[in-house]
């Protein structure tokens, strides 16, 4: 269990970044965190990782208030990992396999176990075809997959993804969505922070919407996005499938593929 209860956070310069924020990562298998720039998404990620301590309120981990000592933070980070928007922030080696194996080797895990786990996660993210390729020759999307593999190899329960589809072409976005859904089916709890509203709508089963460091609204994905007034308050736009439903009278579809399957049947 990982959640926050009424946390607020103020930076040293006096800027109030979060105010009375409560979120529960057990609300869904893939949870979306949305809001305009400066709404507090990145700050909240740092709270969930124990990097920043709330000014007030509590972060709960495995049913207990998080203690900010070395032992407690080590236990937290064995269960919670993050993949940053820019994969170059997380890739340190020129060789893909060595980079993914880096954390495991630092922990002193046997080389046999390291090789097995690295192979498994590279298969999970579809990176085996370029596992021996120098990192500098990888595409941006391939680097993103390597960064995810580096987080997955630690076998954490929760995965925090910061803008996972940013900078990707349509094929890269499709591959990333498939990876995220595959991980959720394998039992990972995933929190996605993104400006890609269509991604959040299609892939998430629960959403938290932030505005100026507070939770403006939360709920099941369709429920949140159908409330246009909240979307506008947050400085966001509705997903295109929601717009089709509300403005053109189409049935409410969750997936793009479902919409095109429906229209194909109608045309035929």
UniProtKB/Swiss-Prot annotation:
<keyword id="KW-0547">Nucleotide-binding</keyword>
<dbReference type="Pfam" id="PF00005">
    <property type="entry name" value="ABC_tran"/>
</dbReference>
<dbReference type="GO" id="GO:0016887">
    <property type="term" value="F:ATP hydrolysis activity"/>
</dbReference>
<keyword id="KW-0472">Membrane</keyword>
<dbReference type="GO" id="GO:0043190">
    <property type="term" value="C:ATP-binding cassette (ABC) transporter complex"/>
</dbReference>
<keyword id="KW-1003">Cell membrane</keyword>
<feature type="binding site">
    <location>
        <begin position="35"/>
        <end position="42"/>
    </location>
    <ligand>
        <name>ATP</name>
    </ligand>
</feature>
<keyword id="KW-0813">Transport</keyword>
<dbReference type="InterPro" id="IPR003439">
    <property type="entry name" value="ABC_transporter-like_ATP-bd"/>
</dbReference>
<dbReference type="GO" id="GO:0005524">
    <property type="term" value="F:ATP binding"/>
</dbReference>
<protein>
    <recommendedName>
        <fullName>Putative ABC transporter ATP-binding protein lin1170</fullName>
        <ecNumber>7.-.-.-</ecNumber>
    </recommendedName>
</protein>
<dbReference type="InterPro" id="IPR015856">
    <property type="entry name" value="ABC_transpr_CbiO/EcfA_su"/>
</dbReference>
<dbReference type="InterPro" id="IPR003593">
    <property type="entry name" value="AAA+_ATPase"/>
</dbReference>
<dbReference type="InterPro" id="IPR027417">
    <property type="entry name" value="P-loop_NTPase"/>
</dbReference>
<keyword id="KW-1278">Translocase</keyword>
<feature type="domain" description="ABC transporter">
    <location>
        <begin position="2"/>
        <end position="237"/>
    </location>
</feature>
<dbReference type="InterPro" id="IPR050095">
    <property type="entry name" value="ECF_ABC_transporter_ATP-bd"/>
</dbReference>
<dbReference type="GO" id="GO:0006824">
    <property type="term" value="P:cobalt ion transport"/>
</dbReference>
<dbReference type="GO" id="GO:0042626">
    <property type="term" value="F:ATPase-coupled transmembrane transporter activity"/>
</dbReference>
<comment type="similarity">
    <text>Belongs to the ABC transporter superfamily.</text>
</comment>
<dbReference type="InterPro" id="IPR017871">
    <property type="entry name" value="ABC_transporter-like_CS"/>
</dbReference>
<keyword id="KW-0067">ATP-binding</keyword>
<comment type="function">
    <text>Probably part of an ABC transporter complex. Responsible for energy coupling to the transport system.</text>
</comment>
<dbReference type="InterPro" id="IPR005876">
    <property type="entry name" value="Co_trans_ATP-bd"/>
</dbReference>
């Amino acid at each position: 269990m990982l959640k926050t209860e009424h946390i607020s956070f103020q930076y040293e310069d006096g800027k109030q970044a979060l105010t009375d924020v409560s979120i529960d990562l057990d609300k869904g298998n893939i949870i979306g965190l949305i809001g305009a720039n400066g709404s507090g998404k990145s700050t909240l990620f740092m709270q969930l990782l124990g990097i920043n301590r709330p000014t007030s309120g509590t972060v709960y981990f495995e049913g207990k208030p998080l203690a900010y000592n070395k032992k407690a933070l080590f236990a937290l980070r064995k269960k919670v990992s993050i993949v940053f928007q820019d994969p170059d922030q997380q890739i340190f080696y020129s060789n893909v396999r060595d980079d993914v194996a880096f954390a495991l080797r630092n922990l002193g895990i046997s080389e046999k176990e390291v090789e097995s786990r690295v192979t498994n996660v590279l298969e999970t993210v579809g990176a085996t075809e370029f596992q021996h390729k120098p990192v500098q020759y990888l595409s941006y999307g391939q680097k993103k997959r390597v960064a995810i593999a580096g987080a997955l190899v630690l076998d954490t329960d929760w995965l925090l993804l910061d803008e996972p589809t940013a900078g990707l072409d349509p094929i890269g976005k499709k591959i990333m969505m498939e990876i995220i859904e595959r991980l959720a089916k394998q039992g990972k709890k995933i929190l996605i922070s993104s400006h890609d509203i269509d991604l959040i709508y299609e892939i998430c089963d629960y959403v938290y919407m932030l505005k100026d460091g507070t939770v403006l609204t939360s709920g099941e994905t369709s429920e949140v996005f159908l409330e246009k007034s909240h979307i506008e308050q947050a400085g966001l736009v509705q997903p295109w499938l929601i717009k089709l439903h509300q403005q053109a009278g189409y049935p409410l579809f969750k997936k793009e593929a479902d919409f095109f399957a429906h229209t194909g049947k109608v045309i035929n």
